[in-house]
Amino acid sequence: MSTLEELDALDQSQQGGSSNNEGLDGIEQEILAAGIDELNSRTRLLENDIKVMKSEFQRLTHEKSTMLEKIKENQEKISNNKMLPYLVGNVVEILDMQPDEVDVQESANQNSEATRVGKSAVIKTSTRQTIFLPLIGLVEPEELHPGDLIGVNKDSYLIIDKLPSEYDSRVKAMEVDEKPTERYSDIGGLSKQIEELFEAIVLPMQQADKFRKLGVKPPKGCLMFGPPGTGKTLLARACAAQSNATFLKLAAPQLVQMFIGDGAKLVRDAFALAKEKSPAIIFIDELDAIGTKRFDSEKAGDREVQRTMLELLNQLDGFSSDDRVKVIAATNRVDTLDPALLRSGRLDRKLEFPLPNEEARVGILRIHSRKMAIDDDINWEELARSTDEYNGAMLKSVCVEAGMIALRQGDTKINHEHFMDGILEVQMRKSKTLQYFA
């Protein structure tokens, strides 16, 4: 079998060789059949083709070297133009220019790409100059929008870089970097308020798809009102700790500024920062400082406070409102707030924080004393009955005073009598019935 296979392979190789010889013979026959004049003309044509190819090769090589030199020169120009410091400016408007509207100067080193007409820009620099740029610079026009902060060359005014958005330093300080340690389990007697706040603020951020499926638009904000010491700020801190959203805490008295328009600018910057870092929660404490009912006044300070509140109304449900930014407001004087703040579409969910009842007082006392060394024979129900009309802050003071009394007496554990003495200590400070509303 091996001998037959070798013979077949030899026959195939001979057939392939004969076919190659036939091809060579065919070429040789064609050349042999041609005359001398035809061969000379073919040779001259080939030589001309070679000369044309060589000249084309030389031209392309020269163009390549020229383009490399231009690229190197342009890179040096770009590096020189990008040398710091930049001149800071703002984009006023982006324009679409037609070819017949721009007069492009003719020069020897300009090509079709350099004279290409596209988008132009109007900018305003920090030196209060308004400048028109036929060529924008190193930033793509699609990335620029009116109002953007930019860095321009101080000589040619070409846009070199797009700078990050500028916010007031006071607004940046409002962002809570370290999350609070409070949890919902640290709040006693407010289970209904916790559930409603979770449904209105946290749930739309964590499970937005459920709201979209049902076609329900979640509330934009939540207003917490009630007497002092009932846990409004504590619940807001727990909400910040349990949610993964950016949390901005601002007190309404911070928004009352001396200069006209300064408070409204703080409100705009706070909401702009929240939109940039969305989802976000803005907590406004002591809302009654800026949210009082509007009235006619000749004092500039009163008018400035009202302008600040109007800016807050615009941010809550104006053209620039954002569903990914939730607002939590807290106040002790809900009766003095402007009706425009309380209407639906702004602060939709209203949560009342009343004084805790007897069952809630038991839960609050247990929460504040769970890390304390206490006896097992403490009657929490009796302590709750003895602390009628106490708010959560006063109940915490009772636990602190009981611990101080036990420490003063040298005891190693806090018993029921210590708590009763603590109640008397807090009661002496409460000289009269607390009235927080006029």
From Swiss-Prot:
Residue ranges that the Swiss-Prot or TrEMBL entry lists as coiled coil: none
Gene3D superfamilies: 1.10.8.60, Nucleic acid-binding proteins (2.40.50.140), P-loop containing nucleotide triphosphate hydrolases (3.40.50.300)
Keywords assigned by UniProt, alphabetized: ATP-binding, Cytoplasm, Nucleotide-binding, Nucleus, Proteasome
Family annotation (SMART domains): AAA (SM00382)
GO MF term (any one): proteasome-activating activity
InterPro entries: 26S_Proteasome_ATPase, AAA+_ATPase, AAA_lid_3, ATPase_AAA_core, ATPase_AAA_CS, NA-bd_OB-fold, P-loop_NTPase, Prot_ATP_ID_OB_2nd
Location within or outside the cell: Cytoplasm; Nucleus
Binding locations of ATP: 226-233
Domain of life, per lineage: Eukaryota
GO CC terms: cytosol; nucleus; proteasome regulatory particle, base subcomplex
Bias (Polar residues): 11-22
Region (Disordered), start-end ranges: 1-24
UniProt record, GO biological process: proteasome-mediated ubiquitin-dependent protein catabolic process
Similarity comment text for this entry: Belongs to the AAA ATPase family.
Protein name: 26S proteasome regulatory subunit 6A
Organism encoding this protein: Schizosaccharomyces pombe (strain 972 / ATCC 24843) (Fission yeast)
Gene name for this UniProt entry: tbp1
